[in-house]
């Protein structure tokens, strides 16, 4: 498992690493939104990132089911 994580972190263009980076960004913005509830641009950014991550996960599911399972776990 750590071998795969190292491969993903070295290859920032891979779908798995993009999903991981989007997830980290969404979590960071969600924490920000917890303290700044009326930050509507942040809400919009989170929605856009969620849609992008959903599309990448769908692509990964169609192309590489093992990679999809690794990302989801």
Swiss-Prot record:
Its main location: plastid. InterPro entries: Ribosomal_uS15, Ribosomal_uS15_bac-type, uS15_NS1_RNA-bd_sf. GO terms for biological process: translation. One of its GO terms (molecular function) is structural constituent of ribosome. It is found in: Plastid, Chloroplast. Keywords: Chloroplast, Plastid, Ribonucleoprotein, Ribosomal protein. GO terms for cellular component: chloroplast; ribonucleoprotein complex; ribosome. Part of the 30S ribosomal subunit. It comes from Welwitschia mirabilis. Belongs to the universal ribosomal protein uS15 family. This is Small ribosomal subunit protein uS15c.
């Amino acid at each position: 498992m750590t071998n795969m994580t190292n491969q993903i972190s070295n290859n920032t263009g891979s779908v798995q690493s993009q999903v991981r980076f989007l997830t980290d960004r969404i979590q960071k913005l969600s924490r920000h939104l917890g303290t700044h509830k009326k930050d509507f641009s942040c809400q919009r950014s989170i929605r856009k990132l969620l849609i992008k991550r959903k599309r990448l996960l769908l692509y990964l599911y169609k192309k590489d089911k093992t990679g999809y399972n690794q990302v989801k776990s």
